Amino acid sequence: MNRKKNSRQAAVIDIDSNLLKMRIAQLRKNAISDLDRLEKPVRLGHEVFTTDKISFESLRELSELLKGYGEVMKEYDVGPYRVVATTALREAKNRSFVVDQLKIQNDMTVEVLEENQEKALIYSKVLEYLGRAQGKRKESALIAYIGAGTIGFAVYDGAKMIFSQNIPMGSIKLHDMLSGVENDTDNFYAVVEEYLDTVMGHIAIPTETGQVTNLVLTGGGIQLIARVCNVDTSGESFEIGTDRLKELFRQICSAPQEKIGIRYNLAEESADLLYSSLAIAIRLMDFSTSDKVIFPKAELWDALIHHMLVPKSETMFREQIRASAISCAQNIATAYHCNRAHSECIRKFACKIFDKMKGFHGLDGRERLLLELAAILHECGYYVAVKQHLLNSFDLIKDMDIYGMTDEEMLIAAYVARYNDDDVPSYEEPGIDGLSDEKRLVVAKLVAIFRLANALDKSQKQKLKDISVRQENNRLMISAKSDADLLLEKWAFAQCAPFFQEVFGLHPELSIQSGLI
């Protein structure tokens, strides 16, 4: 045990698809260092990807391993710790039962991270690495995470993420899904490549920044690729030429599958993982012009440990999420031909109203971000059809991959965009009813603010360049200067005022002063 005085200890337990991992680290003299790392193989991924459930045999094994990890944490006098789970538990149909039993048997609260949460944490450490490696030279990069059950993509323009998407197809899941075909063909590799083409060929990487110049990969199979290539992995990253990876892939494809493990001294399961990871990596090379692949050491627990031991880093992470989420939403809005000037106008107005009402809405920065996303994306439904464009917008937004945002958060943003006209939320709707009372209140509050902001640019001509907002007694006073004809905006504002007052108990009033006075 290497714990020292005047240090803080924290731990992360990661329930992965094929490993149960724990990392214990300490903060001493402003530096984070590892005290211990443990990992045990599990087969949760194989089980879930083939049966959709985690068996009680696997649950009992997992519980016993967690008890052992708990004892190790006591030995190190660990303070804060987090237990997180990713794809396997996320996709298990009986995940609620599993999480409940682990809470009862181990007194551990398991956080099942959604795809975008998991990827954003990993990408944040990749971005830290790129910041150090590139220095002042800011270059674009396609950052991809090859997990056991998912592949995550993000495009970095040198300052922020501008695109993010997840595919439910990782290295283990890819092999397990197609394993039934393996005995029916002598060219299993061709089947895998064709399947990857059908899945990944529809990814539309933004081209605003030109060709993506760097390809950055991370994930569970990366160390395996490095081992087979005899690459030194002692530093914080390593690089392998694309030609070398393609040649390795050709060698694997030309050998009978049973000989791959013998040739590279790998267990059968590792050989399957090597092939699947390489197949995905080769396909990802099509999205970049780089002649090499960068493999930084960036794992989920790196970010979680950092946030626990250095709390201010979590504030920086949240700001990174906000900037990248807005950037991704703006790129999607452009693809759907949304009116950028209008959406930016009401986004500014909505944020001003939100910020001046902190004592009345009780919402935080995350909900403010949802308001911004709704403003940016609320017109995307017009791309499908003018008829029922609000419902079209709702259907599109709720299923969007926006950097760092959860499914529930995107559902809330979709509802805010859905009710931006003359309609108001109804708790009788199945979707609204599926939200908790707390989240339904969030929807109502954001809708009330959003509709008021949208009314101020009803003509979509930005007649009001700016507004000032103040609360006075039981009134919300919104004032502006303009010489334009604002009859439409005043009418829309009056239509939205009753619902706003119903939600907040404040009567909104609009005061326009002529700019000529």
Task: Label each region the model flagged.
Residues 10, 27, 47-75, 88-93, ...:
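Helical "lid/coupling" subdomains associated with nucleotide-phosphate turnover
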Residues 291, 504-517:
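A short amphipathic beta-strand at an alpha->beta junction
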Residues 486-507:
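Short, non-transmembrane amphipathic alpha-helical segments
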